[in-house]
Amino acid sequence: MEKVHDEGPFYHGTKAKLKIGDYLRAGFASNYDSRVTMNHIYFTTLKDGASFAAQIAAGKAEVPHVYLVEPTGPYENDPNVTDKKFPGNPTRSYRSTAPLKIIAEVTDWVQQPQDKIDSLREKIAARTTNNKSTIIN
């Protein structure tokens, strides 16, 4: 993995209710395409980026959660967003094959408008249905 110089703090957004000391691991279905088993666990230095991911991942009846996490191994820039629409890694998104340790739950994040969440979910679903979405895994 390429050395990344961002040292955090790091956040992960999810629909899972976890406890301090738990570990997030790769090897589960993608939140965006259930046909894909993820080889990496993703995280960001942007708290509101993690919260948006959690809100998109969470079902309508599920509560999104944002956690302060600590990588337990090497990590790299997320190739799904790095050097795509914009040069570099403006989303400050990373991924690792090593687990992320839950340090704390974060509650001071921005709730996105439901229509924005629904719109992005619909776009993801349409791209997945039409096989136009590819996760670099």
Predicted regions span which residues?
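ADP-ribose/NAD+-binding catalytic cleft of ART/PARP-like enzymes
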Residues: M1-I41, Q55-I56
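Active-site and NAD+-binding cores of ADP-ribose-processing enzymes
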Residues: H5, G13-K15, D22-Y23, K60-N137
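Conserved aromatic
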Residues: F43-T45
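Short active-site loop/helix that positions an aromatic residue
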Residues: K47-A61
